[in-house]
């Protein structure tokens, strides 16, 4: 689901995963949601962001956690 929406590039945001075509990191989206921001607030603050991209960031984080758990 997220593979076309989340990209990494060592020359963009120090290689952190970002929403494709932006400099919005997955980390930033997760931090905002964890701090209590709503999806609508994120969309208002970042006009290039979409609901699909926010869902992709969550799916990416979940996949990463599952990968880490499987490796331990």
What do the predicted segments below correspond to?
Residues 1-13:
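Basic, low-complexity segments
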Residues 17-60:
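Amphipathic, hydrophobic secondary-structure cores in small proteins
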Residues 64-65:
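Hydrophobic, amphipathic alpha-helical faces that serve as interaction scaffolds
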Residues 68-72:
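Short Lys/Arg-enriched helix C-cap and helix-to-coil transition segments
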């Amino acid at each position: 689901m997220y593979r076309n929406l989340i990209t990494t590039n060592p020359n963009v945001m120090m290689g952190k995963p970002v929403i494709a075509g932006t400099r919005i990191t997955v980390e930033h989206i997760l931090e905002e949601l964890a701090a209590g921001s709503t999806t609508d607030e994120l969309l208002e603050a970042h006009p290039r962001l979409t609901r699909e991209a926010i869902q992709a960031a969550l799916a990416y984080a979940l996949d990463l956690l599952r990968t880490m758990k499987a490796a331990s």
